[in-house]
Amino acid sequence: MNIEIIPVTAFQQNCSLIWDDEKNAAIIDPGGEAERLIQRIEELDLNLKVLLLTHGHLDHVGAAMQLKQHFGVEIWGSNEKDKFLFESLPEQAQRFGLPNIDAFLPDRWFNQEGEILKLDGFNFEILHLPGHTPGHIGFIEHEKKVAFTGDVLFQGGIGRTDFPRGDYETLISSIRTKLLPLNDDIIIIAGHGSYTTIGQEKRSNPFLNSKS
């Protein structure tokens, strides 16, 4: 698996461009700067197959429709419990003082816990990781030891829960019951900031080691 992390917009959201040896590609969480992403995909001569979304916040989906229209591909994800966020994208943009983004819905929801998504060269287990948003999901590639987990678990931190329908206890439960049981050597590609590993966060993440 080839992975290129492209931080986009003022939010510095980690857009993950992944591709196999045959140059079949997917993008996870294209949060913005569509022209830049298009240019990079074309520079690498990749065959973009699908757009994957972990959740419905604007900074993770902002370029999805432009990429869909340019490349003629579908948008898949998140869990349908985030539908209200996709429907409220114009309000999200207004709240942050950003140019308008039209509401849209993904072509496919991932509502089945543990579903295996088979793409060219990749096999992702879909985990429902609510807390940051109610429909947040993660894409886990066990064989290649990498997990794309959006805004759930960060290096030394966790996702915010002060957005609509966020819930701290639910987020902590998602991390403890879904992510921490993964192998320690699995690399976490978070929605913002540096990558980390499951083992590192088990040992040193203050939000997970607190006795409170």
Swiss-Prot record:
GO biological process, one term: response to toxic substance
Its biological purpose: Type II glyoxalase, isozyme of GloB, that hydrolyzes (R)-S-lactoylglutathione to (R)-lactate and glutathione. Plays a role in methylglyoxal (MG) detoxification.
Organism listed in the record: Haemophilus influenzae (strain ATCC 51907 / DSM 11121 / KW20 / Rd)
Keyword Hydrolase: yes
Family: Belongs to the metallo-beta-lactamase superfamily. Glyoxalase II family.
Keywords (A to Z) from UniProt: Detoxification, Hydrolase, Metal-binding, Zinc
Protein's name in the database: Hydroxyacylglutathione hydrolase GloC
Presence of the UniProt keyword Metal-binding in the record: yes
GO molecular function: hydroxyacylglutathione hydrolase activity; metal ion binding
CDD domains: YcbL-like_MBL-fold
